[in-house]
Amino acid sequence: MDTETKKRIDQLLNDHKIVLFMKGNKTMPMCGFSNTATQILNTLNIKYFTYDILEDENIRKAIKEYSSWPTIPQLYINREFIGGADIMLELFETGELQAQVEALLAT
């Protein structure tokens, strides 16, 4: 990953407390996994930022290296990589995702 792309990812994560790198956007997800991720976050009724990786080839390739995670979507809370749609669903079902969001909002 080039330095400029890493800086762009760092800036996105610094600018937004909750970031979902996904295919499409929160109003029009472009794959089933991205749709699942947005539905989970919408259910939590929280403010979050989405970044459409389909519109940016450099970020699409680099985010996988940045997180050491091979798939999209990717959720970050407070700059920390949480996981993809399957992990988000598991954390949501156990209440852990809500707890992480509540801890973030309490700060």
Curated annotation (Swiss-Prot):
Localization (cell): Plastid, Chloroplast
Pfam family, one: Glutaredoxin
Binding-site residues, [2Fe-2S] cluster: C31
Keyword Iron: yes
Keyword Chloroplast on entry: yes
Superkingdom: Eukaryota
One cellular-component annotation, GO: chloroplast
Domain Glutaredoxin: 6-107
InterPro entries tied to this protein: Glutaredoxin, GRX_PICOT-like, Monothiol_GRX, Monothiol_GRX-rel, Thioredoxin-like_sf
Molecular function (Gene Ontology), one example: metal ion binding
Binding annotation for glutathione: K23, R60, A85, D86
Keywords per UniProt: 2Fe-2S, Chloroplast, Iron, Iron-sulfur, Metal-binding, Plastid, Redox-active center
Family indicated by similarity: Belongs to the glutaredoxin family. Monothiol subfamily.
Protein name: Uncharacterized monothiol glutaredoxin ycf64
